[in-house]
Amino acid sequence: KVVGAAVYKDTENVLPLFAMQAALGGVAFCASQEKTALILTGGEISAEWLLEQVSQIQRKAGQFVVFDLKNVIAELPIENRANCFDATVAAYLLNPLKSDYMYEDVAREQLGLMIDEKADGRTKACYEAYTAFAAKEPLENRLKDTKSWELFENIEMPLVFTLYEMEQNG
């Protein structure tokens, strides 16, 4: 089963300059065309509990699809590297001349979906999780059609983890 996921950062009480340092506010998930859920931290849901749940979902998913996996690894526990699919890397391989690979672009290019730029962060996290889920199959099919699947699977995906580890170790 394919699971799309996205990190929601709680940036409401943080200056824009420090938005990347904001605390984990929640995680959005999508595993069907009909439903996307955002689980927020706060109240009875601690960040630690949420991360445990994410770990279980990630480990058991057939494919765990996110945008910008290298940055997601810093926020979410990734125990099963073999089932990860980085939609950003896939989009890059399909169009290496672009300067950025935002989920909004993938939504438009792969799904014909326009994302409301004025949506709040919570809504955007849900859109990102949905786009990760829904775009996985078309991205994979296009990678196979362009003979880039083996490059993606055998070189690019393992490299994401290597680059993350290099950044962590200095």
Predicted regions span which residues?
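Conserved RNase H-like, two-metal-ion catalytic cores of nucleic-acid enzymes
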Residues: K1-Q110
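Mixed-charge, glycine-rich, non-catalytic linkers/tails in nucleic-acid processing enzymes
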Residues: I78-E79, V106, K118-G170
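A basic/glycine-biased coupling hinge at the interface between accessory DNA-binding modules
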Residues: L111-M114, K118
